[in-house]
Amino acid sequence: MQIRKPRTSRALLDIILAVMGMIILLINVPGAKELVPPIKYMLTVSWEDGTTTDIDTHILTPKNKNVYFSQKNSGDVALNRDDLGSRGDPSDINLELISFRGLSNGIYYISIHNYRNNNRPTKFVKLELFDFHSGLKLYNNIVEAPIEGEELPVFKFFVKNGKITTTEESNRYVIGNSR
């Protein structure tokens, strides 16, 4: 005896394939712009490895958005790695990474905040701002770490036509502007 497959399964398969084809066309539209702009600049904030000090980076954008551990993305700025100072962190390397994409014109303010300073406090914090594609350092400085609970304004940079034009020291507090 020969078993016949019902024709409805063939029709259902045809419908599923047609729907999947339309979905693929919608996802891969020729000439469509990238959904996520590429990284243009990268900021690294680092301090002595192995310490339990938790240094937090705060970035105030020209749109008055504070990017930090509780608000990790503003569209053009993202905190990619929030370091907790080896407390609950699988790595002893103390490093925060911030990426910048499609920057808005205006001034970006960078400050650091000593959130927690247990056992072995860190003394210095290093901040480096790179052009992501060329590797060129636009800012490089080592500052004295603020005492626990304190914020330290570090530097600011100016953006025109999506490019960083100037970096300089700053005395503007970011946390004070976001509360």
Q: What are these regions, as identified by a protein language model?
A:
Residues 1-18:
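N-terminal Sec-pathway targeting helices
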Residues 21-179:
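Intrinsic-disorder/low-complexity signal
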